[in-house]
From Swiss-Prot:
Catalytic activity: 3-methyl-2-oxobutanoate + (6R)-5,10-methylene-5,6,7,8-tetrahydrofolate + H2O = 2-dehydropantoate + (6S)-5,6,7,8-tetrahydrofolate
Pathway the protein contributes to: Cofactor biosynthesis; (R)-pantothenate biosynthesis; (R)-pantoate from 3-methyl-2-oxobutanoate: step 1/2
Quaternary structure and interacting proteins, as annotated: Homodecamer; pentamer of dimers.
Binding site for 3-methyl-2-oxobutanoate: D45, S46, D84, K112
CDD domains: KPHMT-like (cd06557)
Species assigned in the record: Escherichia coli O17:K52:H18 (strain UMN026 / ExPEC)
Domain of life: Bacteria
Protein EC: 2.1.2.11
Protein name: 3-methyl-2-oxobutanoate hydroxymethyltransferase
Keywords per UniProt: Cytoplasm, Magnesium, Metal-binding, Pantothenate biosynthesis, Transferase
Family: Belongs to the PanB family.
Record bears the keyword tRNA processing: no
GO annotation (BP), single: pantothenate biosynthetic process
Pfam families associated with the record: Pantoate_transf
Length: 264
């Protein structure tokens, strides 16, 4: 199978073809996703909650991400594999480069970092040193203590303009992808249309170029609070492979996320 690349996603954006992505943390699920044609995966620091049982992503280390990245890469050798740089792993550009090198050696094609214009220098440095970067704006879980919880971001003109400005700054610095989390649909549309790079949404409506879900949410195995934007595809299909195919089909057709999964 031909490898999926950043250029593949750029082509999807140009052709207005929506694409699905998902988090993955181990060999078996990565192989299953790849076998079903779901070829863009993220080793997210969400593993702190879904795999390790913490109440936030903050305890996750670079070593944790590298371990799971290597496992996912073995399961899906041709996927486009993103890996999060976790909390406090990119406080300076130099630290970001050192930690990015670790997860790239483990098998990542790209690193994802959370934050706006303050990251411009870091994005430039990584890009110049052949480390592709995915930005992450809106609800950035590593900032949960500043936000005072997991809340929708970008409501109101000032907040919306700030997020659009951040998105443009990250793109100008060299970011090649952007994740938008928990923002109003109207803002997600503005940002997606303003950027040349593909935008992946989670809780951002069906107006972005792609979608991502935490796999535990997609299969209804998350304990406790279920995010508004989540949908249990396994409940509808009763089969995990069929659930993956259903998720992809609904994203590609624009059925998911629906109005009931979106914010305004």
């Amino acid at each position: 199978m031909k490898p999926t690349t950043i250029a593949s996603l750029q082509k999807c954006k140009q052709e207005k073809k929506r694409f699905a992505t998902i988090t993955a943390y181990d060999y078996s699920f990565a192989k299953l996703f790849a076998d079903e044609g779901l070829n863009v995966m993220l080793v997210g620091d969400s593993l702190g909650m879904t795999v390790q049982g913490h109440d936030s992503t903050l305890p996750v280390t670079v070593a944790d991400i590298a371990y799971h990245t290597a496992a996912v890469r073995r399961g899906a050798p041709n996927c486009l594999l993103l890996a999060d740089l976790p909390f406090m792993a990119y406080a300076t550009p130099e630290q970001a480069f050192e930690n990015a090198a670790t997860v790239m050696r483990a098998g990542a094609n790209m690193v994802k970092i959370e934050g706006g214009e303050w990251l411009v220098e870091t994005v430039q440095m990584l890009t110049e040193r052949a480390v592709p970067v995915c930005g992450h704006l809106g609800l950035t879980p590593q900032s949960v203590n500043i936000f005072g919880g997991y809340k929708v971001q970008g409501r109101g003109d000032e907040a919306a303009d700030r997020l659009l400005s951040d998105a443009l700054a990250l793109e100008a610095a060299g970011a090649q992808l952007l994740v938008l989390e928990c923002v109003p649909v109207e803002l997600a549309k503005r940002i997606t249309e303003a950027l040349a790079i593909p935008v992946i949404g989670i809780g951002a409506g069906n107006v972005t170029d792609g979608q991502i879900l935490v796999m535990h949410d997609a299969f209804g195995i998350t304990g406790g609070h279920i995010p508004k934007f989540a949908k249990n595809f396994l409940a509808e299909t009763g089969d995990i492979r069929a659930a993956v195919r259903q998720y992809m089909a609904e994203v590609e057709s624009g059925v998911y996320p629906g109005e009931e999964h979106s914010f305004h």
